[in-house]
């Protein structure tokens, strides 16, 4: 049986929707994330900043933690949207490695004129643990 192609454009569009909910009152760096489960549910996340900066959460971890807390544990793809199609931070890379495994990671900007498709191995060649 052939593996069905992932509709990454829809996933990116959903990450753009999530980005609109970002709370980035200090950095004004808004990020949205859309995580596709193995049963085709899309879980959204956005970055949420705090004056106590270490309490800030990235969009990727918000989406992943939300999915895990809802009982999802198998995933097909993740899309992350920021102004410059930024790569995930170190802690997000580690969480992607631990909980999502080897799935495509799509990085884009709101105009969707730049799309990078990466693997966690490319982003985190030497994971912790």
Identify the meaning behind each predicted range.
Residues 26-28:
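Short solvent-exposed loop/turn micro-motifs enriched in small/polar/acidic residues
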